Amino acid sequence: MDGGYSWLSLAQGVFNTQVNRWDRSSCNGGLRWQIYAYQAGYELKNTISNGGLFQLSARLARYTNNHTYSDWAERIWDWMASTPLMENTTWNVADSTQVGDSCTSQGNNQWSYNYGTMLSGAAYMYAHVCLSSSPLALETN
């Protein structure tokens, strides 16, 4: 990249920006779909926003072996599994949930890109944890 920055520093900058948007004030966490209250999607938390951060965290964990990133990937996965966004018995991945009802309902739409984002992030976490030669990774499997 020009300007003395690396792709890694760009990815880390995006990660830092996104985790600062983690919204603990509603639904016990998660990213809102849009960032400004006047936008129609502000009242939604959706899979692509949270799944994108999950995937980025998992990829950074794999690339850097920094536990901050793997901790965030686990936090995002666990949060999504605690909401209607990701049903961890049927593996239904919903598009969105409403902040107004404390994220207890889901939008009926399912999109393949949401599944792809979650599968990719899960694959990076698998590679980070299970394919690592570090003793810590072997102990946690």
Write out the residue ranges for each language-model feature.
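Glycan-recognition and catalytic cores of secretory/periplasmic carbohydrate-active enzymes
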Residues: 1-141
